[in-house]
């Protein structure tokens, strides 16, 4: 079972390097890792389990956050309309995106960052990604709003980018041009 002690924190080399492409079909170990990552997210969102094991709630996690430099991400959350996004993916890649941007009005957080980081993180308002799922099937997703932000955050992790790298250092609350907030 993955716990917070398994999650590496900012400054760890795996968080600043591009992760390796995962071979498909997935190995038994890669499938198990994906399942474990998914279970961590579910556990972190269950109040009783999270309290028992001192887990911070998360909606996404990437293998580099576990010190594993592979292009593997897991997502588990419901959007504002109650649609469940729950999946483990390998080799996710943004293949197209909008010019329009968006940002979370409350800012972003990260399981690998133990401190509050203030500022807006500009993201594409809409993205299309291609990936492979845990069953070795190709996946193509068109995302907008909060789901698009979550996926971009996790894809950044496999590319060695932390969310705070995208914040305007001179004016952290600068509203990016051509953007709209997401509550």
UniProtKB/Swiss-Prot annotation:
Keywords: Hydrolase, Iron, Metal-binding, Protein biosynthesis. Binds 1 Fe(2+) ion. One of its GO terms (biological process) is co-translational protein modification. One of its GO terms (molecular function) is metal ion binding. It catalyses: N-terminal N-formyl-L-methionyl-[peptide] + H2O = N-terminal L-methionyl-[peptide] + formate. Removes the formyl group from the N-terminal Met of newly synthesized proteins. Requires at least a dipeptide for an efficient rate of reaction. N-terminal L-methionine is a prerequisite for activity but the enzyme has broad specificity at other positions. Belongs to the polypeptide deformylase family. This is Peptide deformylase. The gene is def.
């Amino acid at each position: 079972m993955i716990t917070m002690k398994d999650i590496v924190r900012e400054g760890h080399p795996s968080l600043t390097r591009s992760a390796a492409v995962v071979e498909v079909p997935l190995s038994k170990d890669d499938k198990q890792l994906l399942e474990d990552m998914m279970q961590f997210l579910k556990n972190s969102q269950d109040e009783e389990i999270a309290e028992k094991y001192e887990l911070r709630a998360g909606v996404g996690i990437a293998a580099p956050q576990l010190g594993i430099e592979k292009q593997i991400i897991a997502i588990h959350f419901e959007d504002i309309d109650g649609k469940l996004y729950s999946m483990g993916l390998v080799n996710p890649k943004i293949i197209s995106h909008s010019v329009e941007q968006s940002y979370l009005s409350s800012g972003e957080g990260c399981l690998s960052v133990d401190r509050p980081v203030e500022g807006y993180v500009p993201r594409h308002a809409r993205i299309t990604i291609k990936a492979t799922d845990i069953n070795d099937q190709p996946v193509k997703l068109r995302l907008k709003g909060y789901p698009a932000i979550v996926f971009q955050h996790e894809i950044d992790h496999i590319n060695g980018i932390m969310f705070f790298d995208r914040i305007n250092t001179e004016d952290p609350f600068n509203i990016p041009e051509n953007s709209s907030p997401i509550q």
